[in-house]
Amino acid sequence: MDNHNSSHQLYKKAMALVLAGGRGSRLYNLTDTRAKPAVYFGGKFRIVDFALSNCLNSGIRRIGVVTQYKSHSLLRHIQRGWGFLRGELNEFIDLLPAQQRVDEESWYRGTADAVYQNIDILRSYGPEYVIVLAGDHIYKMDYSVMLRDHAQSGYKCTVGCVEIAEEEAYAFGIMGIDEDRKITSFIEKPKKNAPTIPGTTDRCYASMGIYIFNSDYLYDLLEEDIANKESSHDFGKDIIPRVVSENQALAHPFSMSCVPRGEGIEPYWRDVGTIDAFWEANLDLAANMPELNIYDKDWPVWTAQEQLPPAKFVPDRKGNHGVITNTLTSGGCIVLGSQISKSLMFSKVRVSAGCEIDQCVIMPEVVVGENCRLKKVVIDKGCDIPAGMVIGEDPIEDAKNFYRTDKGVVLVTKKMIDELKEK
């Protein structure tokens, strides 16, 4: 059987489970009203769209989305933008809120518990393989390649991993592997002595939060884990170390299945779990030749599409046309005679005359008043920035009025603006 037919048969036997219930507390006020996977990204998308699009483009069309924290906007987004799969062809996206399976007061207590609470639903669909995905990372990956790697290996679990510098290991689950890619150790967020990639002294393999299991093996692991009162019911802390101890875990480097892939191509994967990382990943897209290609017709990023008029750039009352460079602009935006560079504007943004905007991420329905100066600012949905406001130039004022990171990125939310107006 050739690889194409083999992959086709495999993805028909697989079901993906996207874990999209996380709060994302390191994004601070950006997740006050929404779960991290529902946060806006890239000018028109939500973070969860990348994992869901990877599923679709990989041929995986049986998908469960596990939700919990402030899930309304996420549920609405998926219902509006992802309702085109056809149930009569055994295609679906099943929305899975916490089942309170353990007791009537327990919500999801960890990533493994989130899957366990949906174990009956998984069994009812009868997949041979279960693909567990984090719903809060930015990347393009062909899961069918990883699935084929898993099926051909004979291992019962395969863990997607990305190469990182050793000094970054403290933030990830790090795996040690042998020359055949068998995982020999797995350490969650090591502070020192992280296992390095064979043949290197300063590079590590970090877990991407992507796992493929033989389904029966996964069910057994989850049922044993839930009975263990000492467990934190987490894949990285409990399940994967158990699999490694049983010699059943294979490492799958992201470079094998990233899109695109090939010699000289640097795989693009970002954990946008902090304001700085979120801002940087968005601004990556404003580069002349961005590392992440969102214009690839062969691997599109799907999302909910609101019917909006085209963006419009017009001169101000004095006839000043303004200058827009290296900026992504979505439908429904209107910009009057302003200078905007290296920025992203989501839908229905209004920028008044005389503004200077540099390296900003401006979410939907934001109104920027006249003569504002904004630099390195993330502006949440629905903010009304008063005329003449300056953000990003005075660290002390920024920290007093908004949330400012150590790297100088300023987060502005509607609540912050409203409180500032009341002073």
Swiss-Prot record:
EC id: 2.7.7.27
Record-level GO BP terms: glycogen biosynthetic process
Entry keywords, A to Z: ATP-binding, Carbohydrate metabolism, Glycogen biosynthesis, Glycogen metabolism, Nucleotide-binding, Nucleotidyltransferase, Transferase
GO molecular function: ATP binding; glucose-1-phosphate adenylyltransferase activity
Catalytic reactions of this protein: alpha-D-glucose 1-phosphate + ATP + H(+) = ADP-alpha-D-glucose + diphosphate
Enzyme class name: transferase
Keyword Aminoacyl-tRNA synthetase: no
Disulfide bridge partners, by residue number: none
CDD domains the UniProt entry points to: ADP_Glucose_PP, LbH_G1P_AT_C
Residues binding alpha-D-glucose 1-phosphate: 108, 173, 188-189, 207
Pathway the protein takes part in: Glycan biosynthesis; glycogen biosynthesis
Assembly description: Homotetramer.
Family: Belongs to the bacterial/plant glucose-1-phosphate adenylyltransferase family.
Function text: Involved in the biosynthesis of ADP-glucose, a building block required for the elongation reactions to produce glycogen. Catalyzes the reaction between ATP and alpha-D-glucose 1-phosphate (G1P) to produce pyrophosphate and ADP-Glc.
NCBIfam families according to UniProt: glgC, PRK00725.1, PRK00844.1
Protein name in the entry: Glucose-1-phosphate adenylyltransferase
Species the sequence originates in: Francisella philomiragia subsp. philomiragia (strain ATCC 25017 / CCUG 19701 / FSC 153 / O#319-036)
